[in-house]
Design a protein with these regions (language model features):
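ATP/NTP phosphate-donor binding region
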Residues: 2-102
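Accessory alpha-helical/coil subdomains and C-terminal extensions
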Residues: 27-29, 33-34, 57-68, 184-265
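Short beta-strand segments
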Residues: 33-35, 113-115, 138-141, 173-179, ...
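Gly/Ser/Thr-rich loops at beta-strand to alpha-helix junctions
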Residues: 34-40, 115-121, 181-183
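Short glycine/serine/threonine-rich phosphate/pyrophosphate-binding segments
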Residues: 41-42, 118-124, 153-157
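Short acidic, glycine-rich surface-loop motifs adjacent to enzyme active sites
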Residues: 105-120, 263-265
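Short Gly/Thr/Asp-enriched flexible loops that form oxyanion-binding sites at enzyme active sites
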Residues: 113-135
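Internal gly/pro-rich beta-alpha loop/helix module
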Residues: 139-212
């Protein structure tokens, strides 16, 4: 599915919608940015495969978890609606700039990004390097579509909002919430194509957990991120094209020449 973002400011203006039905002055506001993926997927009731990723709009996804608006105000921002395999550098830039723009709003306490799991770790790390705010930015997703038996997306989204609204999450960089655990964007990875515990923190483990609406942290990331990062996407519309090549026994050296002729580095 193609992504088109010719007019950034107009896209921002059209994308931001405040959910007014449960809006209460004085409560924290969490902006939920949706990009599609399994968490917004829809298919045959009870089936875990053969679904359409990104079928639910931002409003439909948020409405499917009514508990979200019980303690915080929700602002829905639809970035795109794609399978995470179709996420592009242009979408990354749009996402980072949207967060940076909205972070200037004092009413917004934090952000949640719903995302497909195949490239979630890449998007999380990109945002960790390019978002310019100490406000919590939390990515989450699902391994099963909303129409599946024992779907995991609703709880992940709810716990991500809990983490984004918690003041203890401020200044920790971009985070990922899955299966009750909170991971650093720098360490998070996907280790399974079907298990609901597929997202993990690798050798570093998790930073903390979400239990009964409460957020607990046990450690903090020490590497530079967000406001301390030197990367700035405010004035660019595309990323340099850099290929990553994997080599193996008897690999054809011509692969390097092919990639070099079609990339910036």
């Amino acid at each position: 599915m193609a992504y088109n973002n010719k007019n950034y400011l107009e896209k921002i203006k059209q994308a931001v919608e405040v959910t007014k039905a449960h809006y209460e002055p004085g409560r924290k506001t969490v902006a939920i940015l949706t990009t599609g993926g399994t968490i917004a997927g829809s298919g045959e009731i009870g089936k875990e495969t053969g679904y359409v990723p990104g079928a639910l709009s931002a409003e439909e996804l948020i409405a499917s978890v009514p508990q979200l608006s019980e303690s915080v105000n929700i602002r829905a921002v639809e970035i795109c609606s794609v399978n995470s395999d179709d996420i592009t550098g242009e979408i990354w830039i749009h996402m980072a700039r949207t967060i940076n723009e909205l972070a200037q709003d004092d009413e917004i306490a934090g952000f949640v990004v719903t995302h497909g799991t195949d490239t979630l770790e890449e998007s999380a790390y990109f945002l960790d390097l390019t978002v310019k705010t100490d406000k919590p930015v939390v990515l989450t997703g699902a391994m099963r579509p909303a129409t599946s038996l024992s779907a995991d997306g609703a709880m992940s989204l709810y716990q991500a909002v809990c983490a984004a609204a918690d003041k203890k999450s401020v200044g920790l960089g971009v985070l990922c919430v899955f299966s009750d655990q909170i991971f650093s964007a720098r360490a998070v990875g996907k280790s399974s194509t079907y298990q609901v515990t597929a997202i993990s923190g690798g050798e570093t483990g998790c930073l903390g957990v979400v239990r009964n609406d409460e957020v607990f942290y046990y450690q903090a990331p020490l590497r530079r991120h967000t406001t301390a990062s030197e990367f700035d996407v405010s004035a660019i519309s595309r990323l340099p094209k850099v290929e990553i090549l994997y080599f193996y026994v008897d690999a054809d050296p011509a692969i390097v020449e092919f990639a070099a002729a079609r990339s910036d580095g």
